[in-house]
């Protein structure tokens, strides 16, 4: 099994963790934006089937 030779520095670990967190933040922001556009009816990327409840 592969074992790292040296310990990763705290700063490098923090940088990698922040990059990982930033990816999640942008994914959540994009999902929220898409949800907003779908709810207001401004989405142009795809079609949503409208259901008639009455």
Curated annotation (Swiss-Prot):
Keywords: Chloroplast, Plastid, Ribonucleoprotein, Ribosomal protein. GO terms for cellular component: chloroplast; large ribosomal subunit. The keyword Methyltransferase does not apply. It comes from the Eukaryota. InterPro entries: Ribosomal_bL32, Ribosomal_bL32_plant/cyanobact, Ribosomal_zn-bd. The keyword Cytoplasm does not apply. GO terms for molecular function: structural constituent of ribosome. It is found in: Plastid, Chloroplast. GO terms for biological process: translation. Belongs to the bacterial ribosomal protein bL32 family. This is Large ribosomal subunit protein bL32c. It comes from Panax ginseng. The gene is rpl32.
